[in-house]
């Protein structure tokens, strides 16, 4: 038996499609949204549509931005000769919070996972290799320490080694299987400072 009206059930169903949101959390969010003032709901809906329509990939590093170049790639104060490779834009934000990394990034938007059918062509490796045609001294691989992250790191290392560009991997300290988004800034900073050559 369905306890809710079709509109509430549909809202719960749509919210539960979001990552990390189960049916109970979706229900709480749905009722919160329904009880919000109409203007706030309209603003939320407009913001979602606006973000979806205007956010795109930075033409250089592939992070999400609303401009052609993200603020990091557009900055002349950043070290454009050092590129940190991360799985997604959330991990870029995690490293930025340390305030200690002054290079630029490359966002893969995924990791190699044969079990899930994700191969090298499914992530942004082509764009990374194109960037390496420019003036780059070092690539820091900061993918997750999961099996997929390690597989991706080794694959990238093998691609880059023939170019003569220095390749390093963030140090451990980031727990195996740990999600970088939830690692504190000090641990991330130590992992970055203790990176090793591959």
Regions found by a protein language model. Name each.
Residues 8-17, 27, 33-36, 76, ...:
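S-adenosyl-L-methionine-dependent methyltransferase catalytic core, i.e., the SAM/SAH-binding region
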Residues 19, 38, 51, 63, ...:
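Conserved phosphate/pyrophosphate-binding and hydrolysis machinery centered on Walker-type P-loop NTPases
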Residues 16, 34, 49, 62, ...:
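Signal for well-folded cores of large energy- and translation-related assemblies
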Residues 26, 75-143:
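Extended interfacial segments that mediate partner engagement and assembly in macromolecular machines
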Residues 28, 43, 56, 68, ...:
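Residue-level signal for pocket-adjacent positions within structured domains
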Residues 129-198:
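Long C-terminal interaction/binding lobes of large macromolecular proteins
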